[in-house]
Curated annotation (Swiss-Prot):
Protein name as it appears in the record: Prolyl oligopeptidase ophP
Gene: ophP
GO biological process: proteolysis
Active-site residue numbers: S580 (charge relay system), D665 (charge relay system), H701 (charge relay system)
InterPro entries: AB_hydrolase_fold (IPR029058), Pept_S9_AS (IPR002471), Pept_S9A_N (IPR023302), Peptidase_S9_cat (IPR001375), Peptidase_S9A (IPR002470), Prolyl_oligopep/macrocyclase (IPR051167)
Subunit structure: Monomer.
Similarity annotation: Belongs to the peptidase S9A family.
Protein's job: Prolyl oligopeptidase; part of the gene cluster that mediates the biosynthesis of omphalotin A, a highly methylated cyclic dodecapeptide with nematodicidal activity. Excises and catalyzes the macrocyclization of the methylated core peptide of OphMA to yield omphalotin A. OphP works in a two-step fashion with an initial cleavage at the N-terminus, followed by a second cleavage at the C-terminus of the core peptide.
Organism name: Omphalotus olearius
Keywords annotated in UniProt: Hydrolase, Protease, Serine protease, Virulence
Pfam families reported in the protein's UniProt record: Peptidase_S9, Peptidase_S9_N
Enzyme Commission designation: 3.4.21.26
Amino acid sequence: MSFPGWGPYPPVERDETSAITYSSKLHGSVTVRDPYSQLEVPFEDSEETKAFVHSQRKFARTYLDENPDREAWLETLKKSWNYRRFSALKPESDGHYYFEYNDGLQSQLSLYRVRMGEEDTVLTESGPGGELFFNPNLLSLDGNAALTGFVMSPCGNYWAYGVSEHGSDWMSIYVRKTSSPHLPSQERGKDPGRMNDKIRHVRFFIVSWTSDSKGFFYSRYPPEDDEGKGNAPAMNCMVYYHRIGEDQESDVLVHEDPEHPFWISSVQLTPSGRYILFAASRDASHTQLVKIADLHENDIGTNMKWKNLHDPWEARFTIVGDEGSKIYFMTNLKAKNYKVATFDANHPDEGLTTLIAEDPNAFLVSASIHAQDKLLLVYLRNASHEIHIRDLTTGKPLGRIFEDLLGQFMVSGRRQDNDIFVLFSSFLSPGTVYRYTFGEEKGHSSLFRAISIPGLNLDDFMTESVFYPSKDGTSVHMFITRPKDVLLDGTSPVLQYGYGGFSLAMLPTFSLSTLLFCKIYRAIYAIPNIRGGSEYGESWHREGMLDKKQNVFDDFNAATEWLIANKYASKDRIAIRGGSNGGVLTTACANQAPGLYRCVITIEGIIDMLRFPKFTFGASWRSEYGDPEDPEDFDFIFKYSPYHNIPPPGDTIMPAMLFFTAAYDDRVSPLHTFKHVAALQHNFPKGPNPCLMRIDLNSGHFAGKSTQEMLEETADEYSFIGKSMGLTMQTQGSVDSSRWSCVTV
């Protein structure tokens, strides 16, 4: 059998002697071969890894660039992406509303502001309006600097913000005065106007200002020479307090715990600034060690007197608000779907009092206080959001708002304001901002602004909900989006997306590129709400984790089988897609049911399930996947681990496979993709379908990529899928973006 026209694959050394011995409850000592362990050495530290990366990049680039549809897709995406989009307005303590805005093809969203009372002047046909406050596109020459978070001081004079480069989890925190906005004419590659404060060694933007606005608390790690590079696990998280205007070396240590190097520590402050909540997380589970202190009675430092909020490792707590000594929390204490409870800091022995009981059929996503005494609750029910309002004092239901909208909501507002802004989006809604005003008896809502995409008629598409049986008989929900005129005759191509883990729900989310895929290829887009997510509460999550992880793969495969049986899909034209934890899904499904799929897209996936705890944040994922060094856990992990369960050479035909990874991904190390692709290419060197790896040398885990880079990736992905499934681009498919794309009411 000769090599396909695009072969052979680049050579890579295979060490048949490399192996690791594990303890198994069922089999005792088990020796597991790891012939590509040398690829665990980071790109910048190994000539072998570097040579592997460069040869694979060249090989994949040659194949992808030879596809004529690639340039057609890129041109279509560029034209279609040139529409204006924005966020809801967020009130801040300096008397302004802030909102994010992109005029089309900017690399990153910019931040604008407008004085309260003048908000009707923004986002009109003449442009964004208001005043440009911060433009991250000016921070770097290549557009790869990203704003990771920001929070304003209570006095409204200072603005703390995080900036990461090239998608790294590592960031620096800076401070600027709100009286020093960016200017449109500023030179790129600089950030003039910021103060001298620079906080380094930060991996999470968790910042809490003190009520006097003199400084803030933050979490950080010890100095490391290789921040943003390598596979070393993040260890020894600490909490510090930074005073404005001082060097980081003078910051005050609040907490450290060298005995538990993998724990992640952070603090929250109540809105009044009086109480500080300390929380330590030892893994990705919904449990923490939580303590509380009164800043009126303590000097900031390591000698603060903390009171236990509850027994450790039983629940997670998020501050909702406070009133005197009463603190409102959202918690899953004896409520796996979360509830709202109160705690009296003056009487800690009394424990928590439930204000809003857990809803057994819906997952509480967020809770916030508005109009002084109204509690706004966002629930996740049947894979979509609901907004309910309760009386803050009694918990009495006051009604549900936006009942007729099926999708997801983002709410912004403050307790002292009677108005909130709500951003709604769904598969067929790119974003609609509503203004809701609370009233004594009943509030009212009005349309504020809506994003529109000229030339793309969203009425040409439809989304439907179906239920299908999984392998064990469990009924699973699935969203299906398609052009209305696509016939259900068993000939349509399908792009199926999944995640299935970490309690992350797959909500109705707008994706212009996905709609273009459906339009141009006359295709169907399917998202099954498989177990492992929180679409149906925490129980749904638990049914897809640890020793029940196989349910996730069974649910996903069953969705594909249902689509074929019900003539939504052609059995020879099904592509699946997943990233990060979803990479476990796509690679496991490809191993277990290779004949079910024609094309598999895996983006920065976790794949070597026996080695994941050794790198980056992998140790914290053991609560989700199990611990490979635990004999009982080893047995169920080894059974599905994609890297260790690739079908052997023989008659198996694997789908066309395209892997995306980033050489400097410091969340999910690229070693997972490197090793898996090397093993696949070894087992199937002359298979009829290609196995390629697209390696980015300039980004990290999803975040921080410029618009241009994202469009380049999408063009590679969609043209690869099209070629693999024999699809023809029906039309240029771009939309006319020459007209204004905002509806004003």
